[in-house]
């Protein structure tokens, strides 16, 4: 982390990364980042425990990845507020609807996928802003 010059701000983006880490390791990383990079933002994707189980049964198995023993999962982004007093805000948006909502522009199949991802596996894009 010391190699990163964040003197003019920083945004960290991690897509599909934290599923491979244990929750306690993710918690330590987020806390360390909040201390090292005040005012920065961290954006990442998440899903709930059901979604993590589905990943374990499907694409990780198909990819031959067997050494992933514990997955980071998130039922509600508000859980993260308890992780560090250095978090200024924690917000989330639908993973499938993202920052530009296309729901009204897609067909029935995609609308069903969006609803599945939003309600059953709670796929989200999460943003943490660290305190200055």
For the regions a protein language model found, what residue spans apply to each?
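Alpha-helical subdomain
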Residues: 1-132
